[in-house]
């Protein structure tokens, strides 16, 4: 069992502590599924106001469900469909204030109100997966979350391939 000292007082401190902890976790394991699982658990445990966090792995032209924390989720998402599929197809971060107004949104959990999806790139800049964070609070994610989660996923991407 791991024990971490993570300060959740401010987003800046939270993301700094998460980054340090994630680097420690990843340095101990080479398996990509184990690393995604621990990353999802770390974020789920310390980031407030989330109702789902997890990974979709890029396999051909689909995103296939990977390790996650939260309710049962959609298993297969085509590139270009919904927030996750759009992030994978465009290679761009999707920060959605209100998922109910997002075109082509896939609703796996009707209680989700906002969503942040970040593509995870490997060493050759290929998209390996996306991380999907969902919140029941509209407008939950801001520029600090985008920056902080992006740094976490840059580190994870180096360990995934």
Curated annotation (Swiss-Prot):
A GO cellular-component term linked to this record: cytosol
Pfam families tied to this protein: GAF_2
GO molecular function: L-methionine-(R)-S-oxide reductase activity
Spans traversing the lipid bilayer: none
Cross-referenced PANTHER family: FREE METHIONINE-R-SULFOXIDE REDUCTASE, GAF/PUTATIVE CYTOSKELETAL PROTEIN
Family statement drawn from the similarity comment of this UniProt entry: Belongs to the free Met sulfoxide reductase family.
Designated name of the protein: Protein ZMO0507
């Amino acid at each position: 069992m791991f024990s971490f000292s993570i300060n959740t007082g401010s987003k800046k401190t939270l993301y700094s502590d998460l980054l340090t902890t994630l680097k420690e976790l990843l340095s101990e394991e080479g398996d990509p599924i184990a690393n995604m699982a621990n990353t999802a658990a770390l974020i789920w445990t310390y980031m407030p106001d989330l109702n789902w966090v997890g990974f979709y792995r890029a396999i051909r032209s689909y995103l296939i469900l990977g390790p996650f924390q939260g309710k049962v989720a959609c298993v297969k998402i085509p590139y270009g469909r919904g927030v996750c599929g759009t992030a994978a197809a465009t290679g761009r971060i999707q920060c959605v204030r209100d998922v109910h107004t997002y075109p082509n949104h896939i609703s796996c959990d009707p209680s989700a109100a906002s969503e942040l999806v970040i593509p995870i790139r490997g060493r050759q800049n290929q998209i390996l997966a996306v991380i999907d964070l969902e919140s029941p609070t509209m407008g939950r994610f801001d520029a600090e979350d985008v920056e902080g989660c992006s740094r976490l996923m840059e580190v994870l991407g180096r360990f995934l391939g």
